[in-house]
Amino acid sequence: MSANGAVWGRVRSRLRAFPERLAACGAEAAAYGRCVQASTAPGGRLSKDFCAREFEALRSCFAAAAKKTLEGGC
């Protein structure tokens, strides 16, 4: 039972660190948001993959943040 508690302790600490790590992706999130907003504005040209470059940058940043969280690094 104590081993199970140790596992949950590690999981909780990783989950607590995750929002801080995602905060480092603010520039990517803002760029993606601007792209989506521009494409849905009047006269915008919303189409599949229109913001793919911005989305990929955001996804990569989130993946890097998740990896750091799982590794327990800074």
UniProtKB/Swiss-Prot annotation:
Keyword Lipoprotein included in the entry's annotation: no
Keyword Disulfide bond included in the entry's annotation: yes
Ranges for domain CHCH: 22-69
Subcellular locations according to the entry: Mitochondrion
Motif (Cx9C motif 2): 51-61
One of the GO biological process terms: mitochondrial respiratory chain complex I assembly
Keyword line: Disease variant, Disulfide bond, Mitochondrion, Primary mitochondrial disease
GO cellular component: mitochondrial matrix; mitochondrion
Segments carrying motif Cx9C motif 1: 25-35
Intrachain disulfide bonds: C25-C61, C35-C51
Disease: Mitochondrial complex I deficiency, nuclear type 34: A form of mitochondrial complex I deficiency, the most common biochemical signature of mitochondrial disorders, a group of highly heterogeneous conditions characterized by defective oxidative phosphorylation, which collectively affects 1 in 5-10000 live births. Clinical disorders have variable severity, ranging from lethal neonatal disease to adult-onset neurodegenerative disorders.
Function of the molecule: Involved in the assembly of mitochondrial NADH:ubiquinone oxidoreductase complex (complex I, MT-ND1). Required to stabilize NDUFAF5.
Record PANTHER family: NADH DEHYDROGENASE [UBIQUINONE] 1 ALPHA SUBCOMPLEX ASSEMBLY FACTOR 8
Subunit structure: Interacts with NDUFAF5.
Protein name as it appears in the record: NADH dehydrogenase [ubiquinone] 1 alpha subcomplex assembly factor 8
